[in-house]
Amino acid sequence: MVRVLHVTNAFPYEGSIDYGVFIKEQIEAARDLGVESETVFINGREGGKKAYLKSRSKIHELAQKYDVVHCHHLYSGLATALALTGKPSVLSFLTDWPYEAEGINSMMARTLLCTIGVHWADRVIFKSPVPKHLTDPKKFINLPNGVDETHFGVRDRGEARRRLGLDQDAIYLLFVSSKGYHRPQKRYDVFTATRDQLNERAGYEKYRELLLVKQPRDVVIDYFAAADVHLLSSDFEGSPNSVKEALCCGLPVVSRDVGNVRDMLEGLPRAVTLDSADPNLLADAVEDVLGQSADREAVRAAFLAKGLDRHSITRRLVGIYEELARGAQR
């Protein structure tokens, strides 16, 4: 079976148990299918850019035991490129091009770093649609994270609200951010303005916010069960995992047109995508999905029919590993 070294700058650690949890779960899912693996976590949050440079010798040494190196995030890929492993490489972009190069103000510099990364890697995975200028379908692959459909499902809303200490009669708009609700990309200001617009129309505080930030995985599902709508107000995303988890729980979704959300929501009941950050239009969409009659089981079933469950996605990922490993052995 194929052996894979994972290099990532997002992974759960003490003090941030939900950070990069989707990468951790993807690695575990591949391991369940027989992939032997090890992970190098570059904690750039605490170590800054120097952490990437310091990781090079460790990446080089460990990579010699593996068939393929999978780099999660552009910066992990650039550190691995400098490590000169001599191994086939997979680079996963975690958000839209060129926003992957976070922390850099110059759009030209961002684009340059992204270009260097995709030129270096043997396979490049995008969670959102592949940028149009990258035309090699064998090298550039659209493969969003899969959702664990056995864990995320329809639960009783009243019981979930009781466990979270929420008002049984309010309408809750769910906001999700793994790094805190004031993360600029997530546009909490647009979210709150939409909530305020809805309450102004209602004439009282009918709509309330429900913030899902830095919660253990066993608690997260209660937030999806307790909410009435997941409102995604971000300026950009890759393939937002919160949308997939919400839909798997049957929760209606209203989202701006970011990442691959339009593809995920197309044809689903109680799901709307808008190419706008206007709180008035977002409020209209919230009222629209709340007025539809489809139940949560119908939303879940329609979403799962799209093949974005974890097993289906992981099988495709393992196929990429196996192809690269075979090519290296020739």
Where are these predicted regions, by residue range?
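Membrane-proximal helix-turn-helix segments that form the acceptor-binding/catalytic region
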Residues: 60, 97, 106-124
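Conserved acidic donor-binding segment of nucleotide-sugar-dependent glycosyltransferases
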Residues: 267-279, 288-293
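Conserved donor-binding/catalytic core segment of Leloir-type glycosyltransferases
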Residues: 5, 166-186, 192-196
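A short, active-site helix/loop in glycosyltransferases that binds the activated sugar's phosphate group
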Residues: 115-142, 147, 151
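A charged, aromatic-enriched C-terminal amphipathic alpha-helix characteristic of glycosyltransferases
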Residues: 18-21, 291-326
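Short His-centered aromatic/hydrophobic patch
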Residues: 71-76, 93
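Short hydrophobic beta-strand element within catalytic cores of glycosyltransferases
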Residues: 252-255
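Aromatic "clamp/platform" in nucleotide-sugar-dependent glycosyltransferases that forms part
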Residues: 235
